[in-house]
């Protein structure tokens, strides 16, 4: 990760104080996206996947039953 990233502490390259995340499908402008924000659209047998609001990662694929 580039230490010049605006969300990144230049010494530790962890999120700066008051910021939640540096990157990821559920991270924008150093903050987690709101719960329910689509991070991966449905395709084939998959269903939409949604951000949780507490992580920068997109949850694992949900499959239609």
Swiss-Prot record:
Which PROSITE patterns does the UniProt entry name for this protein?
DISINTEGRIN_1, DISINTEGRIN_2
Tell me which GO cellular component terms the UniProt record holds.
extracellular region
**Any idea which UniProt keywords this protein has?**
Cell adhesion, Cell adhesion impairing toxin, Disulfide bond, Secreted, Toxin
Motif Cell attachment site covers 43-45
Record localization: Secreted
User: Where in this chain does the record put each Disintegrin domain?
Assistant: 1-65
Disulfide bond residue pairs? 7-30, 21-27, 26-51, 39-58
Molecular functions (GO terms): toxin activity
Top-rank taxon:
Eukaryota
Give GO BP annotations, semicolon-separated. Answer: cell adhesion
**Statement: the UniProt record of this protein carries the keyword Transcription:** no
A Pfam family in this protein? Disintegrin
Tissues in which the protein is found: Expressed by the venom gland.
On subunit structure and binding partners, the annotation says: Heterodimer with CC8B; disulfide-linked.
State its role. Answer: Inhibits integrins alpha-IIb/beta-3 (ITGA2B/ITGB3), alpha-V/beta-3 (ITGAV/ITGB3), and alpha-5/beta-1 (ITGA5/ITGB1).
What protein family is recorded? Belongs to the disintegrin family. Dimeric disintegrin subfamily.
Q: What is this protein called?
A: Disintegrin CC8A
């Amino acid at each position: 990760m580039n230490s010049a990233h605006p969300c990144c502490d230049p010494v530790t390259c962890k999120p700066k104080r008051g910021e939640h995340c540096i990157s990821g499908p559920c991270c924008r402008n150093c903050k987690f996206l709101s719960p329910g924000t689509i991070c991966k659209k449905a395709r084939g047998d998959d269903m939409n996947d949604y951000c949780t609001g507490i992580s920068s990662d997109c949850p694992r694929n949900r499959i239609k039953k």
